Amino acid sequence: MTTQLRVVHLLPLLLACFVQTSPKQETMKMDCHKDEKGTIYDYEAIALNKNEYVPFKQYVGKHILFVNVATYCGLTAQYPELNALQEELKPYGLVVLGFPCNQFGKQEPGDNKEILPGLKYVRPGGGFVPNFQLFEKGDVNGEKEQKVFSFLKHSCPHPSEILGTFKSISWDPVKVHDIRWNFEKFLVGPDGIPVMRWSHRATVSSVKTDILAYLKQFKTK
C-alpha cells in the first residue's frame, strides 16, 4: 500500500478525533482527592519495544505527567508540544510518560512495533521522535484497563460531567471517572500522589501554565 493510500485510509480516524476537539463550555482541569490510599509507586508498566517492566517507583521525587496517547488523532499534534514541555520543565523534575491506547475512535490501530514508525513518518511525521518514555499499548478504561489508570481515575474526578455518546463508548463496565478521549493528562506529585487531571480539550500550553503554578510551592522549600 502506498503512503498516499495509507493517509486516505487513516482520514476517518483523524476526522473522528477533530469532532471530539470541538470547543465547548466545560471545566478543563480538576484537582485530585487528597485522602486516597496508595501511590503510583505501587504500579509498573512495560516499556514500548523493550519488553521490560518499568517500576514507577524509579520516579520517586519527580513530578510525573501521565498521558494516554494515540497516533492517528487530531490531538496527535500535541506530541511535539509534549516534547517541548518535557524539555523545558525537565530541570524542575517533570517527567512525561505516554500510554498508547486504541479505545477512542480506534486511533491507535497498529501493534506496538508500528507506533514509533507511525509517529516518525505519518503523524506528526517529519522524522518526529518522542523524547519521553512510551509504554506498550493497553486499555485505560473497562475490564482490562491498566491498574495504574484505575488508581489515577479513582484518585481524580473527571473535569467534565459528560461521559460521551453510546457510539463513542467501546468498553465495559463504564464508570463516571473514565477517560473520555485521547490525550487526557494526570499530574502526580513527587510523593507519588495524584495532584490534578485535565480534559483532552485542555491545551498543552494551559497544562504547562497549571504545572508552573503548582511548581512554585517547591521553590520555597
From Swiss-Prot:
Its EC number is 1.11.1.9. It is found in: Secreted. The keyword Coiled coil does not apply. The active site is at C73. Keywords: Oxidoreductase, Peroxidase, Secreted, Signal. One of its GO terms (biological process) is response to oxidative stress. Its main location: secreted. Epididymis. It holds the Pfam family GSHPx. GO terms for molecular function: glutathione peroxidase activity. Residues 1-21 form the signal peptide. It catalyses: 2 glutathione + H2O2 = glutathione disulfide + 2 H2O. This is Epididymal secretory glutathione peroxidase.
